[in-house]
């Protein structure tokens, strides 16, 4: 293998922003944030969904609208879809 062409494969902390669950795994992801975990500094990758918050794994159903997309859609279209479907 050629030297210097492969990304840095290192330990990274992935943190689920909706449940504050985090785990350490190896990845080549480029991050700007860092976090101290177990007395060691790691790069931090923030994710919106993990096995701790995904409805398939938790068995619960919840609306995960972190960007306000559902509310924006409802303001724009209101109940027009409900009337058209009848």
From Swiss-Prot:
Name one molecular function that GO assigns to this entry.
structural constituent of ribosome
User: SUPFAM superfamilies, per this entry?
Assistant: L28p-like
Give the GO biological process terms: translation
User: Which GO CC terms are listed, alphabetically?
Assistant: ribonucleoprotein complex; ribosome
Q: Which HAMAP family match?
A: Ribosomal_bL31_2 (MF_00502)
What UniProt keywords are attached to this protein's entry? Answer: Ribonucleoprotein, Ribosomal protein
| Subunit field text | Part of the 50S ribosomal subunit.
- Organism domain of life: Bacteria
Annotated protein name in UniProt: Large ribosomal subunit protein bL31B
Concerning InterPro entries, the annotation shows: Ribosomal_bL28/bL31-like_sf, Ribosomal_bL31, Ribosomal_bL31_B, Ribosomal_bL31_sf
Give the family per the record.
Belongs to the bacterial ribosomal protein bL31 family. Type B subfamily.
Q: Which cysteines link up through disulfide bonds?
A: none
């Amino acid at each position: 293998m050629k030297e210097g062409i492969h990304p840095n494969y290192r330990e990274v902390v992935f943190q689920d922003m909706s449940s504050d669950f985090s785990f350490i795994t190896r990845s080549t992801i480029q991050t700007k944030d860092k976090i101290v975990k177990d007395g060691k500094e790691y790069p931090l990758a923030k994710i919106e969904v993990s096995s701790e918050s995904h409805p398939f794994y938790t068995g619960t159903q919840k609306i995960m609208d972190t960007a306000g997309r559902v509310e924006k859609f409802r303001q724009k279209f209101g109940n027009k879809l409900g009337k058209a479907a009848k």
